[in-house]
């Protein structure tokens, strides 16, 4: 365990968030999503499980570390309430048709599957840049 990192974030999830660059996409999905099949086609190449966690809780944990991209009009596809709260600002969300979402997911950096059983609860987050003060 480390200070300041949500306990729901495994070492693998933190590792993937660190590997991602700005503009990379991260998929967070429910258990109904064909995640294992699609994850094989992502940059990371394998599925990451976030067991025991629903999508709102998982998204909040991930967004506690990962900034959203501010250089694109819609850095998120789906789920407004959790994203706005984590970012502290209103975030435009893009809506994608089911099969268009699957294609976009294949181009993502990685896929994290939660234990959420709600249908079509998946979304994509585009990573932004952390603005650090100069030393």
List the predicted regions and their residue ranges:
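Long, hydrophobic N-terminal alpha-helical segment
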Residues: 1-51
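Electropositive phosphate-/nucleotide-binding environments in soluble metabolic enzymes
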Residues: 7, 11, 49-56, 73-76, ...
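Alpha-helical scaffold segments in soluble metabolic enzymes
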Residues: 12-19, 57, 61-65, 78-81, ...
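Residue-level marker of positions within ordered structural domains that often coincide
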Residues: 22, 67, 128
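A structural micro-motif
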Residues: 24, 45, 68, 88-91
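Hydrophobic beta-strand segments of well-ordered beta-sheets in folded domains
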Residues: 26, 67-77
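A phosphate-binding glycine/aspartate-rich beta-alpha loop in the early core of alpha/beta enzymes
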Residues: 38-71
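Glycine-rich, aromatic-bearing surface loops/beta-hairpins
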Residues: 75-135
């Amino acid at each position: 365990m480390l200070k300041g990192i949500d306990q729901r974030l495994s070492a693998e999830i933190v590792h993937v968030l660190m590997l991602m660059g700005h503009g990379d996409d991260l998929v967070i999905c429910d258990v109904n999503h064909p995640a294992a099949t699609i994850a094989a086609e992502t940059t990371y190449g394998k599925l990451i499980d976030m067991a025991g966690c629903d999508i709102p809780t998982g998204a909040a944990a991930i967004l506690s570390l990962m900034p959203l991209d501010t250089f694109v009009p819609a850095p998120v596809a789906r789920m407004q309430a959790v994203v706005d709260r984590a970012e502290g600002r209103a975030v435009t969300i893009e809506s994608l048709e089911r099969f268009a979402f699957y294609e976009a997911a294949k181009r993502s950096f990685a896929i994290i599957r939660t234990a959420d059983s709600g249908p079509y609860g998946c979304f994509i987050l585009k990573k932004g840049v952390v603005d650090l003060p100069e030393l």
